[in-house]
Amino acid sequence: MTPQQPEIQLIANLVVRRPDGRVLLVRYHSDDERWWLPGEDLEPYEHPDDRARATLDRIGGVAPSSFGLAFVESFRGRRGWHVVFHYRVEADGKPDGDHAGEWFEPDDLPRTVHGRWEREAVRRVLE
């Protein structure tokens, strides 16, 4: 029997940092108290840069001064294999887009959906 090919999920993930060093987290679901790093799944054949910029546009009210790929990681997740493109964005402003957003000190992040993984992603992007 041939093993089945795993589902592969491609994700653009952003660590958005203000000049004062705070990072942006968003709430994708109003009934969930946990926070997320901004990010979205890529559409088929979409370039990660394009999805990252679209995610930033949906945040709204945040003006980037720099934008670039920081690192790529892959791991087995609950829904198959994940390939995550982590972007570092220097920006300022008040998020006013599709989802609630707030700025937090990187060393004092609130409860996040993925816990230690998000904290480690922030650390790696900002180092």
Predicted regions and their residues:
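Conserved N-terminal beta-strand and adjoining loop/helix that marks the start
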Residues: 1-23, 41, 72, 88
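A generic fold-level signal
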Residues: 7-9, 18, 79-82, 96-98, ...
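Short, flexible active-site-adjacent loop segments at beta-strand->alpha-helix junctions, enriched
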Residues: 20, 29-30, 73, 93
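Conserved Nudix-box catalytic region and its N-terminal flanking loop in Nudix hydrolases
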Residues: 22-59
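NUDIX/MutT-family hydrolases
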Residues: 33, 88, 95-127
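Short histidine/acidic/glycine/proline-rich micro-motifs that form metal-
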Residues: 42-43, 74-76, 109
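Active-site segment of metal-dependent pyrophosphate-handling enzymes
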Residues: 57, 61-93
